[in-house]
Structure formats: structure tokens, C-alpha cells
């Protein structure tokens, strides 16, 4: 059986990345999130496929087709709740995965990191267009506001927005094309995940110490397959608790009303996982400036390898950088809270301070802390 595992073409493809892969012996539970994200993607594709069988992408029937799925389709309520809350769990895992990458210096595997950031952007785009599909109040107005941001682009902005809408407002054409994109993007993401893994397995996994682990490696199976299975069980438990006990906890109440172009909701806001970026967008009074800041808040991740100044890879033995990292985490939580609040004082000024400190921490303070820690390792006095 050993020889078959290593020689048979199809089994060999599975064997190399999941069974005989040499993995560092000291990686923590923080390294589980890659496999959890793969599982989340599978759950989203499967539940999404079943939802697509019953959903109709038409402005007159979209809202009622979602109600029909929940009321009349066998276990439709469960499929919809798993899909809606699966997106939230997906983003929880995604942000923890990125946080781990920053903390342990995994961004120094540049190709793997850059493909990961592209995956983040594609996942955000998929989740953004999904918001339109139920055709509730927040779907319609969220789509109108978010797509309208493109009108800030000089000269071609207005034309570009109307081209995306397929008309002069968010309407049937917009809903149809957004459904088509929402259906195809997860499969493109799956292909990109394979490329992400290919580049990761070229270098091997990083580890908490940030030191080359080649001298001490163990096979991925059974050690890390068991460890991943535990993480998977916990993730499924959280997802099922959300989907079965409080399925609407993370939804917006406005989305339970059908879309009405004549009635604007009191507060237009995206899903919770975009609130930090939305807060950065709102904190700048100028429209173009806000859009650029929004883009910069995500695209800044591409700069992480360039901003690494420390002689050490990981933050494990760097207390000053650790402190700044946790301040950054607190800052992002503050931005998420601000994004869900109305645009009034004191929320405006808190959002502006948090937005400035977000960029300040990543671009200036963390690289300076790395240089200072280098100096402290070899003081000149």
C-alpha cells in the first residue's frame, strides 16, 4: 500500500501535500486556519449550489424566492442559514489567518503571501456582490452606495458605474450579472487556492520561532491531520450554533423588507466583516480620498514584505513589535465598531483617529520598532 500511495498518479497528488508532507514539529493551532478556510470554501460552494437551484435572479421574484427556499424547500432554511453564517465564519478564519501571517512573519514567503492577498480581494468581491442577491432594502441600497464609489474615478467614473449597473440604476440587469459573478467566483477562488498551496509547498511551512525548521520535521499525517480535524470540529460547532440558534444575529434587520427604491434606510452599512474598511472610507470627507483610503487599507498587505525591517522573522521574541501588533488588532476592532455607528460625533472623530493610526502603525511604527529591536540586540554603547 505504501508503494501504491507513492506511485499511483492520482493518489500521489494527494499524498505529496497531505500525507508525506514534511511539516515543522512545533507549529501551533494558529496554523489550522488554512485547512479551515478550505473547508469553509467547500461548505459555501455546496450550500450555494443548492440555493442556486431554487433562487431566481429577477427583481420581481428574488426576494420571494429566498422566502420560498426558507419555507417550502426541504431543509432550505438550514441551507440558507449555513450559507449566510458560513460567510461570517469564513471571514473570521480569514482574518485570523492573515493575523497569524503578520505575527509570525509568514509574509516573507512573498509569492504565497501575494496570492493570499489576491484571494482575500476575490473573497471580498464575492461577498460584496452576494449582498445584493436577496433583494432586500439593504441589498438594494448597499449595492447602490458601494457601486457608486466608482463614480469617484475621474472622467470615466459615471460611465463605469452605469456600465456595471447595466442601466441608470441598480435594477434587473445588475441583479442578474451579480448572481452570475457570485456563482463563478468561488470556482476561480478554488483554482487560486491550489496555486497558493503549490507555492507554500515549494518553501514549506513557517513556524512560531521563525527559524529554519529543516532539521526537525515530521510527516503531516497523522500528526497534523488529527490536529486539523479537531479545529474542523470546533469550527463546525460554531457554525452550527450560529445557524441553528441565532441565524439572524449577524444579518441586518432592513434586509427582511423587500427592496424599495423610494425609501432609503436610516443607516446604510455593509456586513460586519467589511465595517473596518467602511469606517476608513467614511472617515475621509472627500469621496475620491475615501475610496483611495478604502483600497489602501487592503492593498497595504502587499507592502508587508517590504516593510519588514527586523533581523528576526517572527514577533515571538520581539516585545515592542508584539505590543504594536495587538494595538493594531484593537484598532481594527474599534474601526469595525465605528463602521456600524451613525455618522455623528463622537463616532466621526474616533473613526478618523483610528483610520490614521491604522496606517501609521503599519507603515511607520512597526518598521521603526523592528529597527529599534535590531539595535537593542547589538547595542553600540
Swiss-Prot record:
Annotated InterPro entries: Cyt_b/b6_C (IPR005798), Cyt_b/b6_C_sf (IPR036150), Cyt_b/b6_N (IPR005797), Cytb/b6-like_sf (IPR027387), Cytochrome_b (IPR030689), Cytochrome_b_C_euk/bac (IPR048260), Cytochrome_b_N_euk/bac (IPR048259), Di-haem_cyt_TM (IPR016174)
Keywords: Electron transport, Heme, Iron, Membrane, Metal-binding, Mitochondrion, Mitochondrion inner membrane, Respiratory chain, Transmembrane, Transmembrane helix, Transport, Ubiquinone
Cofactor: heme b
Membrane topology category: Multi-pass membrane protein
Entry coiled-coil feature ranges: none
Matching Pfam families: Cytochrom_B_C (PF00032), Cytochrome_B (PF00033)
Regions that span the bilayer: 33-53, 77-98, 113-133, 178-198, 226-246, 288-308, 320-340, 347-367
Binding sites annotated in the UniProt record for heme b b566: 97, 196
Binding site for a ubiquinone: 201
GO MF annotation list: metal ion binding; ubiquinol-cytochrome-c reductase activity
Subunit-level organization: The cytochrome bc1 complex contains 11 subunits: 3 respiratory subunits (MT-CYB, CYC1 and UQCRFS1), 2 core proteins (UQCRC1 and UQCRC2) and 6 low-molecular weight proteins (UQCRH/QCR6, UQCRB/QCR7, UQCRQ/QCR8, UQCR10/QCR9, UQCR11/QCR10 and a cleavage product of UQCRFS1). This cytochrome bc1 complex then forms a dimer.
This protein's name: Cytochrome b
Lineage, top ranks: Eukaryota, Metazoa, Chordata, Craniata, Vertebrata
